Amino acid sequence: HLTVAESEWKFVRPMTTIDTNQKPGTLDISYAPILTAEQVERIRAFAVSREVTAGEILYQPGDDTPPVFVVMSGGIKIVAVGGGQEQVVTSYGIGQFSGELLMISGRKSIYRCQATESGTLLELKARDLRTIIGRDAELSDVFMKAFLARRLSLKQHGHGNVLVLGSRYSAATLAAREFLARDGHPFTYLDLDVDQTAQELLDHFGVSPSEIPVVICNNSTVLRNPTPQRIAECLGFNSNIDQSQVRDLVVVGAGPAGLAAAVYAASEGLDVLVVERSAPGGQAGSSSKIENYLGFATGVSGQELAASAIAQSEKFGAQIMVARSVNRLICDKRPYRVQLDNGHDIPTHAIVLAMGAQYNRPPLPNLDAFSGRGIYYSATFMEAQLCANEQVIVIGGGNSAGQAAVFLSQTCGGVKMLVRSDNLAQSMSRYLIQRIEENPRIQLLYGSELSALDGHDHLETVSWIEKSSGEISTETIRHVFVMAGASPKTDWLSGCLSLDKKGFVLSGRDLETVTPPNPWPLARQPQMLETSLPGVFVVGDARSGSVKRVASAVGEGSVVVQLIHQVLAEV
């Protein structure tokens, strides 16, 4: 990688002129609530009073776990800094407080915080903030609502320390954007195909088409075609996590099941680490809208659900490691050790396996060549933008495929659903079937399978076969969404746990019919959701015999915590 010099920054992000004399309190009240005198006094018990002078810098971009400041007198501002240029994001006055979600996640600061005038502040360290959030329900609501609203605003306006330059036709660009979006990190995106500034920057640095996307992180470091792991390292996503500490619980996977386990375990005082190979959300994170999840009458997107669950788990003290895969379970003795792809072993007394399952890939030789270039495994707003007003195909007959078809039909020219079976009744919720059947923009093709793909740099034509007649159809279609079947990623568990014929993890009474890799060492029998290894549990889609629904996964993740307490008492 290389570094952007201050003289070169004019190519990267032309700063918008902002009124630096912006008055505090002009933001919507949901973003900048004014604390009552009583609330301030309760905060004061955990905070340190600090006198500041005008212009004093309170923290800088890249500082570890910045504190929250409550303004008693004077004022403060939050500033985006880049290459000698500054942009005031917002400011806070008397009775207001700074901070957003990174204050509870423990990640590095993105912005500068600076006093606008001399005055008095209450400085609240991150650990004390978590104490207040855990003990005071009213203040917990005030802080969390403000932090969530601010992070959403930052994402929507692209206020952050990351700039992605790439092409809508680049699979690597889509992967980088999806990683940052699903992680919830604010970033700005410039498309080479529509933004001349982006092309000028790439020409300036001599970047070839094979090296896109270019990701500029921390407003200085330039990465060429980076992996999610490299982006996470550059931004310090996992830098505050102690990988040698013995944990009460390690959760593998940050989908609905894993996040539910993390929320309930952390809320009950357990030391929890979640390890996610990409970004949080799991398979549910690829869904644009889940309409049959309890409590969301108008539906909720998978990413929204995941973002709320992440904030909820972190507020109780859970830590989430992203862009790290688990390569091996070392199960010869306790505490067990979870070996990461960076070579580190994390010791833990209990483990919850919540890796989920991935969509089955049609057995076509050139499928991977079109991944991100016409073949997609998610249907979010990001993918929908790529195929506006065009014909698309959705493969699958489950809820995820149905949700994708309904969502894409709103902006695409039309949707063809390829379904292997002759009906949807056994695999899809009734409300979705009705939506699809009544939608004139969705065409159901029962008994059909994808048979061929063709194109050059991007998918151009698609063929499918109607199985009963053998008839093959070919059309010019540039976008296919694969959402059929489910396969677990459990090869790293071989030698430790019992798996079924498809690779899903066996648990509870299902273990009675198999011989485990290692003899069961305890007098008691395995508990519900417990695998063939004491203290190792499996929840969600990775479990053999599970119901592949978000609500079921969340239920299992919640229930397993009580069983973990019993296991920890045995250690």
Predicted feature locations:
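Beta1-alpha1 glycine-rich phosphate/pyrophosphate-binding loop at the start
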Residues: 159, 164, 168-195, 205, ...
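Cytosolic regulatory regions built on CNB/CRP/Popeye-like sensor folds
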Residues: 3-178
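Conserved beta-strand termini and adjacent loop/short-helix elements that scaffold enzyme active sites
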Residues: 54-55, 124, 167, 190-192, ...
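A Rossmann-like FAD-binding core segment of flavoenzymes
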Residues: 306-348, 353-355, 409-523, 566-570
